[in-house]
Amino acid sequence: VNVPRAPLTPYHAPPKPVPLTAAFAAVLLAVLTALAPAAAGAQEQVIRGGDVLYSSTGPSCTVGFNAGRGAERYALMQGHCVRDAGLVWYADAARTVEVGRTEGVSFPGDDFAVIHYTNPAFTYPGELSSGLPGGAIEITGAAGPSVGQQVCHAGGTTGLHCGTVVSVNDTVAYPEGTVFGLFRSHACVEPGDGAVPAFSGGTALGLIVSGASCSSGGATFYQPVVPALQAYGLTIS
């Protein structure tokens, strides 16, 4: 009896595994890293006008406005605050995160100082921290004040408060000396407001250097920002 044979299935050896080279592994890791979602809780680190910086010697001072010169970023601040505050500035009260160093101080005579930001992990936009529901206030330029012009500031105590410029070229006497060329408004300040920046619309006008409470009439004096910008070749941006 002839029994038919079943057809034979050809045998193919499995392909040999391709070794994972170091170069290929590095490329694969880079691709997977790029596709991975950002770590939970990661937030952009920002310092705006109206934020507080902490000095190496103890005092803290409020940033007036951020400004630029080329690719470098700077902060305008009160001269009489920075004068006694040391060279190094930190973003935190524990003084562990250095963000800048004092570039120069003009006080008395004027009342402004310039801090050079040195920490690339932060951004320093031309915005003000308002503490209001609308968020940050965008500042796009600077100008000198004029009598009758509206002026506003967002303080930690009074919130957003506005008034009118009532005089320019005013003088204030400090124990350390006299400051000239200030302007004045009736937009009052209260303890806790700090040396907040003053603006009109999207235009930087000045830095508060002294003021009276709202209950006493609210005369507030400001250092104009334009002389400070011109002295260091800076622009608000």
Language-model features: locations:
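Active-site region of chymotrypsin-like
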Residues: V46-P59, G126-P133, G159-S237
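Noncatalytic regulatory segments and standalone regulatory/sensor domains
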Residues: N2-R5, G41-S55, S60-A67
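Short, conserved glycine- and acidic-residue-centered signature motifs
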Residues: A42, P108, P191
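Generic anion/oxyanion-binding catalytic loop in active/binding sites
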Residues: V31, I137, G217
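Secretory targeting and sorting signals
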Residues: V1-A42
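Hydrophobic alpha-helical membrane segments, chiefly transmembrane helices and signal peptide h-regions
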Residues: A25-A34, G64-F65, F112-V114, S210, ...
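Serine endopeptidase catalytic core focused on the charge-relay Asp
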Residues: S55-D170, F199-G201, L205
